Amino acid sequence: MKVLLQLISFLFLGIFGFSQENTKPIPACEFLTKYQNVRDFTISTTQDEIYFSIQNPAEDRAVIAVIKKQKNKWQEPQMTSFSGNYRNIEPFLTQDGLRLYFASNRPIDETTTKAKDYDIWYVERKDLKSKWSKPINVGAPVNSTNNEFYPCITTNGNLYFTADAIKTLGKDDILVCKWDGKQYTEPENLGMNINSTGYEFNAFVSPNEEFIIYTCYGRPDGLGSGDLYISYKNNKGNWDEPKNLGEKINSKQMDYCPFYDTTTQTLYFTSKRMIVIEKTFTNLKEFETEISSYENGFSRIYKYQIKL
């Protein structure tokens, strides 16, 4: 009996000890480790199609890439048909997989090649095996003569995005244009519970609008740069005060571009986290290993298992 009790005690402590361990975010996917500077992540509900952004080190050029799973095996990443020129970032795949929204500084008029401010665009397809259409500008009232970024579409068609001028409380804010069944309504600021006179940007809103995850920059309870925060919608339909997701997820560097996979309860996000170890290097190989590590200050995509 004593041995049995000791065994039960060991298992109990082991189970609960494991759940209390300081688990941390890990690289999102093996194939992403070969890219020096990546950001943004969206995955299909069927778990067989991933879109992400690849940038150059200066972050002034970017393409949206796709990787597909065939016969239970991930294929090589490919550049999407609508990328290759201008700066295309922040893909978001709708629940049915038939539309992909993104932000781009491409010109609206095909007669010019001059880049413009950032707008929300989308491509569409008839079914999951069809090719994407040419990019379509969402238009007003979503887009304006200023910048619009990071689209997120909920099940009812509401479009959440980041704006840096129109209807903001100061700097970047999260706005929503609601879908009334025929068209989008005028942009609405999510209010002081979500936004401030500072920077709030890049929001993921759950399909049923139960919670929102987004980046707040330089807040008093932050860890040093931009942190991921979460807010839940209360029974009155209002957003509660956001809470910092904490040190298990956030870092001292920029943490942004969240995407939550409700199927697997996995949070994907981009981070410029960097682990600096004060050490003396004895040869060049050691230094090369240090600066080429995953957590080296460049944008990288991470994942973290969490039930929200």
Q: What do these predicted ranges mean?
A:
Residues 20-308:
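Short, conserved micro-motifs composed of acidic
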